[in-house]
A protein has these predicted regions:
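Polybasic, lysine-rich low-complexity intrinsically disordered segments
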Residues: 8-10
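N-terminal first-folded block
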Residues: 45-51, 143-144, 168-171, 175-178
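Charged phosphate-binding loop/patch that engages nucleotide di/tri-phosphates or the phosphate backbone
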Residues: 128-138, 252, 258-278
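Short, acidic/hydrophobic/Gly-rich beta-strand patch recurrent on exposed beta strands
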Residues: 159-163
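Hydrophobic N-terminal alpha-helices or hydrophobic patches in metabolic proteins across all domains
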Residues: 17-139
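Conserved N-terminal beta-strand and adjoining loop/helix that marks the start
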Residues: 135-158
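Unchanged
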Residues: 174-261
Length: 278
């Protein structure tokens, strides 16, 4: 069966490879459903009042008719990105909800053109799914961070950190939290992970997109910042090590092409601004 084959494939894949540094998975055997296109037959349209549960539906909800194996434990699907009642909807699975006290899972489906991250989905299903009563995995993730530099003994040095969940050097970054904008997330993450306060340089914003093991579609936004703080205090629970390196050594320490491209752009920016001469 497709469900059993895909489930086995995902479990083997995740056992064989480490995920990106800030990706946390749950009920990994269902990850194969993320990104799939399904057809939903709506049984509880938007604004429907469920007398038994005493709730009014803020989203269309229904049964998944096609796109997944009949043996899968899917009990239904919420539809996001649609602001009116529909009878049938075809869209992409953007999240999987596993209720802690009930069997089976619930999908969250949206149009291909719509992108929602975890806290947006949590807010949308709050009318029926109370936070803390379920686990959730999402197709889309958004992280923000910063390339931080400072002048040490007359030389420009860049901050690299190594996360305990990754063997690779990178920049401080993390998931956006509810109510934050991109710069607020980047500021908080640098402060949490490195213990330093930063100032953002204007007109530098680098966005990259990639997938984690072909299942999670991630967007990362990186800013350029500097600091007057001279003491780096890493978050020991998450960060293993840090370094302040000159440009060439920092480039050699980075593994991923996206990170190298970001640092190269940041270095060019500083050269053009006359902040550094090498």
């Amino acid at each position: 069966m497709l469900y059993l084959q895909e489930r086995k494939k995902i479990c083997i894949m995740l056992d064989s490879f480490s995920l990106a540094s800030d990706f946390v998975g749950c009920f990994r055997e269902f990850l194969y459903m993320l990104g799939k296109y399904v057809r939903v037959r709506v049984t509880k349209p938007m604004h429907f009042f469920d007398k038994e549960k005493n709730i009014s539906y803020d989203l269309n909800f229904g049964n998944v008719e096609s796109g997944i194996d009949a043996l899968s434990p899917v009990k239904g699907a919420y539809i996001m990105g649609v602001t009116h009642r529909v009878r049938v909807f075809e869209g992409r699975v953007i999240a999987i909800i596993k209720r802690k006290d009930l069997g089976g899972i619930i999908l969250v489906v949206a149009p291909k053109s719509k992108r929602y991250i975890v806290h947006q989905i949590e807010d949308a299903v709050e009318f029926a799914e109370k936070r803390g009563t379920y686990d959730i995995n999402c197709l889309y993730e958004s992280s923000c961070g910063a390339i931080v530099y400072r002048i040490i003994n007359g030389e420009t040095r860049f901050l690299l950190i190594k996360n305990k969940r990754s063997a690779n050097w990178g920049f401080p970054k993390g998931h956006m939290e509810r109510g934050e904008n991109e710069k607020e997330t980047a500021y908080r993450e640098v402060l949490e992970e490195a213990g330093i306060r930063i100032r953002f340089l204007p007109d530098f914003r680098f966005r990259s997109e990639y997938s984690i093991q072909g299942r999670i579609e991630k967007q990362v936004v990186i800013f350029l910042a500097t600091t007057d703080d001279t003491t780096t205090i890493i978050q020991r629970e998450e960060i293993e090590e840090y370094l302040w390196l000159k440009f060439d050594k920092a480039m050699n320490s980075l593994k991923f092409p996206n990170d190298k491209q970001m640092l190269r752009k940041a270095h060019e920016y500083l050269l053009n601004a006359g902040v550094t001469n090498g």
